[in-house]
């Protein structure tokens, strides 16, 4: 009987090891109309049941605010609770509306409590604000940005807001392009973060050789550059993708075949190993943008536009070729969640109430804008840069770089002596060393002690 319980524990720990995989979700449709709870719920349900996949069960959000309101909590939250979709919450940090984002965050915590907390993977303060504030962002007409000091101030404000609440200790990060992360003037933001969100789009790196055959190398290089400045903090892949239709960017051709290749070569090695939010499930309802990144067309369907199945070889090869693999443990529930460097993780967050990435919103206007949010045609060299929190598409694009994240892996690797069975059981919720190996070792040690 005891053996059965230990095996069940090992399986539970192994299951919890898989990283979060999901999509970005805007709070408006491509025509600027606000999404309802039913809209979000339909998207989350579709993502969980996509043909050829194990299910995309996480959502990254760009804002806490429901489209068309001042500071009402976004209806993606009750939709996620119904569908049990994990959330990477987001607060829009450009344009001077942050007080309303904080108000919506407070209201959401008060209204949804534990139901929300158990789904939260982390909180993102801003999205590509530093890129939009950069010379490249201004040149690309990417929209209003924010300076690093202000982002740090906002991060501290969010920490104060969640202190003592159900979300207390939630890992807080910032999402930006790799070019923003490697810019030394933004280092204070890295210091303030628990994890770094990486947005990268080789399709937009139009000053480089960026054909689909170059895409994986460009992506890997930009992630590596981000890792190099991340100070040992985890890098979460918060946006990437390849368009299924649209204009050509230098050597990058937008079509289904190339979108499939990018999915296979870049996406498959990430899924289940590194927290990843793909761009995007659907961006063509009711208007198809140019370019369009949606893996389903104008009609929401569990049947994608191209084959999403990942072969064992595509999943393992790129994982092996990464500069640094995903950390063995995560800030949440002991899950592998991001890329880390070899640097020691000295301040690992201990947030344990939620699991999974979340839905996001992109836009070139703010949350009640009618603008479509698509990557800008004047992109300079790489990752997309949404300039406001509106539609389901991503906006202006920036460079090809690296970003770091600070949802660091645990520095603990387990005791040198065999733990007792009771200790193993009591520590199971924290993942024991945060890895599948830890779960297996735990069971072996427990069996040996019987």
Swiss-Prot record:
Propeptide feature: residues: 428-450
Compartments where located: Cell membrane; Secreted, Cell wall
Coiled coil, from the record: none
Active site (UniProt): 128, 239
One cellular-component annotation, GO: fungal-type cell wall
Annotated glycan sites: 183, 362, 368
Residues where lipid is bound covalently (GPI-anchor amidated asparagine): 427
InterPro entries: Beta-glucan_modifiers, Glyco_hydro_17, Glycoside_hydrolase_SF
The UniProt record lists the keyword S-adenosyl-L-methionine: no
Membrane topology type: Lipid-anchor; GPI-anchor
Location of the region described as Disordered in the Swiss-Prot/TrEMBL record: 377-420
Sorted UniProt keywords: Carbohydrate metabolism, Cell membrane, Cell wall, Cell wall biogenesis/degradation, Glycoprotein, GPI-anchor, Hydrolase, Lipoprotein, Membrane, Polysaccharide degradation, Secreted, Signal
Catalytic activity annotation: Hydrolysis of (1->3)-beta-D-glucosidic linkages in (1->3)-beta-D-glucans
Any one Gene Ontology BP term: cell wall organization
Molecular function per GO: glucan endo-1,3-beta-D-glucosidase activity
Keyword Membrane annotated: yes
PTM notes: The GPI-anchor is attached to the protein in the endoplasmic reticulum and serves to target the protein to the cell surface. There, the glucosamine-inositol phospholipid moiety is cleaved off and the GPI-modified mannoprotein is covalently attached via its lipidless GPI glycan remnant to the 1,6-beta-glucan of the outer cell wall layer.
Pfam families, sorted: Glyco_hydro_17 (PF00332)
Entry EC no(s): 3.2.1.39
Listed Low complexity bias regions: 377-395, 405-420
Top EC class for this record: hydrolase
Superkingdom of the source species: Eukaryota
Stated family: Belongs to the glycosyl hydrolase 17 family.
Stated name of the protein: Probable glucan endo-1,3-beta-glucosidase eglC
Gene name as annotated: eglC
């Amino acid at each position: 009987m005891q053996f059965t319980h230990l095996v069940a524990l090992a399986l539970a720990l192994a299951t919890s090891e898989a990283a979060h995989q999901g999509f970005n979700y805007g709070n408006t449709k491509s025509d600027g109309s606000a999404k309802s709870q039913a809209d979000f719920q339909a998207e989350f349900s579709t993502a969980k049941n996509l043909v050829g996949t194990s299910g995309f069960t996480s959502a990254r959000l760009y804002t806490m605010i429901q489209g068309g309101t001042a500071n009402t909590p976004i209806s993606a939250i009750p939709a996620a609770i119904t569908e049990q979709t994990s959330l990477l919450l987001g607060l829009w940090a450009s344009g001077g509306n942050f007080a309303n984002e904080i108000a919506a965050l407070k209201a959401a915590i008060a209204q949804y409590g534990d139901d929300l907390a158990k789904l939260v993977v982390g909180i993102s303060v801003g999205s590509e604000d530093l890129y939009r504030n950069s010379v490249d962002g201004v040149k690309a007409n990417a929209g209003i940005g924010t300076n690093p000091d202000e982002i740090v101030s906002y991060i501290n404000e969010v920490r104060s807001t969640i202190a003592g609440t159900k979300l207390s200790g939630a890992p807080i990060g910032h999402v930006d392009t790799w070019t923003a992360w490697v810019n030394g003037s933004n280092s204070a933001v890295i210091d303030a973060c628990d994890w770094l969100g990486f947005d990268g789009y080789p399709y937009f790196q139009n000053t480089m050789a960026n054909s689909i055959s170059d895409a994986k190398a460009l992506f890997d290089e930009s992630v590596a550059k981000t890792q190099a400045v991340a100070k040992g903090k985890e890098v979460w892949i918060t946006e990437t993708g390849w368009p299924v239709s649209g204009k050509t960017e230098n050597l990058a051709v937008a079509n289904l075949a190339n979108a499939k290749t990018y999915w296979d070569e870049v996406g498959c090695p990430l899924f289940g190993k590194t927290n990843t939010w793909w761009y995007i499930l659907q961006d063509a309802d009711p208007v198809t943008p140019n370019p369009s990144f949606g893996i389903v067309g104008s009609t929401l369907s569990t049947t994608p536009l191209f084959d999403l199945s990942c072969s064992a070889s595509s999943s393992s090869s790129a994982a092996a070729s990464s500069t640094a693999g995903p950390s063995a443990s995560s800030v949440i529930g002991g899950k592998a969640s991001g890329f880390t460097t070899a640097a020691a993780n000295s301040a690992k967050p201990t947030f344990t109430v939620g699991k999974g990435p979340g839905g996001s919103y992109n836009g070139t206007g703010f949350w009640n804008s009618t603008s479509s949010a698509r990557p800008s045609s004047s992109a300079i060299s790489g990752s997309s840069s949404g300039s406001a929190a509106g539609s389901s598409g991503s906006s202006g694009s920036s460079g090809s770089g690296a970003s770091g994240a600070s949802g660091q892996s645990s520095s603990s690797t387990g005791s040198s002596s065999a733990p007792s069975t009771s200790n193993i059981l009591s520590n199971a919720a924290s993942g024991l060393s945060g890895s599948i190996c830890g779960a297996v070792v735990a069971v072996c040690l427990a069996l040996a002690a019987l």
